[in-house]
UniProtKB/Swiss-Prot annotation:
Descriptive protein name: Small ribosomal subunit protein uS13
Quaternary state and interactors: Part of the 30S ribosomal subunit. Forms a loose heterodimer with protein S19. Forms two bridges to the 50S subunit in the 70S ribosome.
Superkingdom of this protein's organism: Bacteria
Region span, Disordered: 99-127
HAMAP family, alphabetized: Ribosomal_uS13
Gene Ontology cellular component list: cytosol; small ribosomal subunit
Phylogenetic lineage: Bacteria, Bacillati, Chloroflexota, Chloroflexia, Chloroflexales
Function: Located at the top of the head of the 30S subunit, it contacts several helices of the 16S rRNA. In the 70S ribosome it contacts the 23S rRNA (bridge B1a) and protein L5 of the 50S subunit (bridge B1b), connecting the 2 subunits; these bridges are implicated in subunit movement. Contacts the tRNAs in the A and P-sites.
NCBIfam families documented for this protein: uS13_bact (TIGR03631)
Primary gene name: rpsM
Length: 127
């Protein structure tokens, strides 16, 4: 099993798809990496040679910010917005949508589940 940037790539998938399992590398960046490493995108991960894996690993480590470093950078950017108190930071702090979506209805992903409705209880059967 090929391991790149701390991620085990699935053996049965093509390298074109498998490389997108690395956080921070999507289809476009993955295609660029494979082009630079001179690897056929249709090759299955199990069929890659050690040399090809090491070339891919080297390019990813040298040119891209991935996994933990990228997650840390994103968190630091959000923290910076919250610290300076800008509008986007306040929205992050309150747990509301940041990019202008409506909140009168919807916004459930960001706000969480609705609280339990008051006054609606299952009646117990009397015998």
């Amino acid at each position: 099993m090929a391991r790149i940037a701390g991620v085990d790539l699935p053996r049965n998938k093509t390298i074109e798809i498998a490389i997108t399992y690395i956080f921070g590398i999507g289809r476009s960046n993955g295609a660029d990496v494979l082009r630079k490493a001179n690897v056929n995108p249709a090759t299955r991960v199990r069929d890659l040679t050690e040399e090809e894996v090491s070339r891919i690993r080297e390019i990813v480590e040298r040119e891209y910010r991935v996994e933990g470093d990228l997650r840390r950078e994103i968190q630091m950017n959000i923290k910076r917005l919250m610290d300076i108190g800008c509008y986007r930071g306040l929205r992050h702090r309150k747990g509301l949508p940041v990019r202008g979506q409506r909140t009168r209805t919807n916004a459930r992903t960001r706000r969480g589940r609705r609280g339990q409705a008051i006054g609606i209880k299952k009646k117990t059967l009397k015998k």
